[in-house]
Design a protein with these regions (language model features):
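Conserved alpha/beta core of the MobA/IspD/sugar-nucleotide pyrophosphorylase nucleotidyltransferase superfamily
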Residues: 2, 91, 169-250
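Short phosphate-binding loop-to-helix
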Residues: 50, 56-114
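A conserved hydrophobic position in a structured secondary element of the catalytic/binding core
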Residues: 53-54, 104, 180, 227
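N-terminal glycine-rich phosphate-binding loop and ensuing alpha1 helix
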Residues: 2-52
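Short, high-confidence coil segments that cap the C-terminus of an alpha-helix
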Residues: 46, 91, 119-122, 212
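Conserved core of the sugar-phosphate nucleotidyltransferase
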Residues: 104-194
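Residues that recognize and position ribonucleotide moieties
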Residues: 17, 95, 102, 144, ...
């Protein structure tokens, strides 16, 4: 088996509490999921791009965009849905691509895929960007603190680290992309949800609670998530900016 076989999987469920049918929402004239598929294809490092979904309409849109759709059942989190999609597939590494970021930078996807390829003993990786003091008190911005080797100690919606003696560079903002070795992803999906995961509403805390090393890399670029319909204009602006830098937003 090719040691470098990497898959990109986009979890895309229909029933979003704040934005039902979000993966099919028109962004610059196309379904949002089509843009995410296009970004993953542009990364150029995946043997295949899959969309894991519970809805046939999303599956059709994914196929039209060039992805392989996989119908999954009810899942606890995006990573659990990704695990269900790849369980029986030939893969070494898997990148969970957020389905609500139509302008996700392809270089961020390459960062994760290349790190896992170069470090087969690293079970899981994610990304972060420098944060600001204002981010600390915003519960919609997830913060991460790491050890000296760049592995996550904790993620929280609360202020971490608490700024009693603030220092430059301590505030880091999590970028919600995840890469896994396949075996690590299947182990993650086999574990029960933990109290920390439920308390914060953050699936990655399941990995930390079970002692899995989660490497945090510096993201190459920021992205824009679509959480509610009001976020669509920002996403369209991000797509236009991506196109102006030489990416495709068609």
């Amino acid at each position: 088996m090719d040691r470098n076989r990497a898959l990109a999987v986009i979890p895309a469920r229909y029933a979003s509490t704040r934005f039902p049918g979000k993966p099919l929402a028109p962004i610059a004239g196309r379904p949002m999921v089509a843009h995410v598929v296009e970004r993953a294809l542009e990364a150029g490092c995946f043997a295949a791009v899959l969309v894991a979904t519970d809805d046939e309409r999303i599956a059709r849109a994914a196929a039209d965009a060039g992805a392989r759709p996989v119908i999954t059942g009810e899942c606890r989190s995006g990573s659990d849905r990704v695990a269900a999609a790849i369980r029986d597939l030939d893969a070494d590494t898997v990148v969970n691509v957020q389905g609500d970021e139509p302008a996700v930078p392809p270089q961020n996807l390459r960062l994760l895929a290349e790190f896992l390829r170069a470090h087969p003993d690293a079970p899981m990786a994610t990304l972060a960007l420098p944060g600001s003091p204002a981010d600390l008190d915003n519960p919609n911005i997830v913060k991460v603190v790491c050890d000296l080797a760049g592995r996550a100690l904790y993620f929280s919606r609360a202020a971490i680290p608490y700024p009693r003696n603030p220092a430059p560079g301590l505030v880091r903002r999590h970028v919600g992309l995840y890469g896994f070795q396949k075996a690590a992803l299947l182990a993650f999906a086999s574990w029960e949800e933990t109290d920390l995961e439920r308390a914060e509403g953050l699936e990655q805390l399941r990995a930390l609670a079970h002692g899995m090393a989660l490497h945090v890399l510096d993201a190459a670029a920021d992205s824009v998530a679509v959480d509610v319909p009001a976020d669509v204009p920002r996403a369209e602006a991000a797509l236009a900016a991506l196109a102006s830098r030489g990416g495709s937003a068609s």
